[in-house]
């Protein structure tokens, strides 16, 4: 809190937690659990003049799962970040600040339009652009590894979406068999993605003054 007081609370077997908040204070709530990335949110009682129950729910990301950043999009054959892509990268930056001991791989994928070599180069430039932005807002470059894989890793559908079933692998041959153009384009959109996953959890930040 803004008093500098630290309050620890463990969840019960349903994942619920509770503690009393003092008036006229702002709180920073940090949650952690083995196998998941730390997550932080803020809440405040400043300006609250009556009793109130605050409900603060957390959705935690598993360390071992590859996380897709859905808002990161690019113009065709470009690697410049669109304005709305910045929001996802800003959220990723906050996650890295909450988890200073992790090193992540930031991976960019393309669709099957164009040839393999150009798609590989394009995806690497896109991954590099994401890393460059994160470094520009204060993330330690040693926490970031940029990888462009081109079209080598087709997306696997996780949840049924119209004609796409859970487990469908969106390979080039699969997409060619799709009858309707709008569904083919949707498959390409699934393949065009940027994601990250945790490589290490033992990084020690360099705190030496330069």
Where are these regions (language model features)?
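Short, acidic Ser/Thr/Gly-rich low-complexity loop/linker segments typical of extracellular
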Residues: 2-16
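Solvent-exposed, polar/charged alpha-helical surfaces in well-ordered, non-transmembrane soluble domains
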Residues: 13, 87-94, 104, 120, ...
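A short, solvent-exposed beta-strand micro-motif common in secreted/extracellular proteins
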Residues: 15, 23-36
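Short strand-edge motifs at loop-to-beta-strand transitions and within beta-strands
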Residues: 15-19, 54-56
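Short, conserved beta-strand segments of beta-strand-rich sandwich/propeller modules, principally
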Residues: 26-30, 103, 131
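Extracellular beta-sheet/turn segments enriched in Thr/Pro/Gly and aliphatic residues
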Residues: 39-72
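Short, solvent-exposed beta-strand/turn patches at coil↔beta or beta↔helix junctions
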Residues: 62-102, 110-118, 182-201, 205-207
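Periplasmic OmpA-like peptidoglycan-binding domain that tethers envelope proteins to the cell wall
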Residues: 109-210
């Amino acid at each position: 809190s803004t008093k500098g007081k630290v309050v620890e609370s463990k969840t019960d077997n349903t994942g619920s937690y509770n503690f009393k908040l003092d008036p006229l204070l702002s709180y920073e709530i940090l949650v952690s659990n083995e196998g998941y990335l730390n997550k932080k949110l803020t809440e405040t009682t400043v300006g609250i003049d009556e009793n109130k129950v605050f409900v603060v729910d957390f959705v935690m990301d598993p360390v071992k799962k590859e996380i897709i950043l859905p808002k990161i999009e690019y113009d065709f054959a470009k690697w410049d970040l669109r304005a709305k892509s910045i929001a996802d990268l800003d959220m990723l930056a906050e996650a890295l600040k909450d988890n200073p001991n992790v090193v992540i791989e930031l991976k960019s994928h393309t669709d099957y339009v164009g040839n393999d070599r150009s798609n590989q180069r394009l995806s690497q430039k896109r991954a590099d652009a994401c890393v460059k932005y994160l470094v520009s807002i204060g993330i330690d470059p040693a926490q970031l590894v940029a990888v462009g894989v081109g079209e080598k890793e087709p997306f696997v559908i996780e949840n049924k979406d119209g004609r796409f079933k859970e487990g469908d692998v969106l390979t080039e041959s699969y997409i060619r068999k799709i009858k309707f153009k709008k569904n083919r384009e949707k498959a390409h959109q699934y393949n065009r993605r940027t994601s990250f996953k945790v490589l290490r959890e033992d990084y020690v930040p360099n705190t030496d003054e330069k």
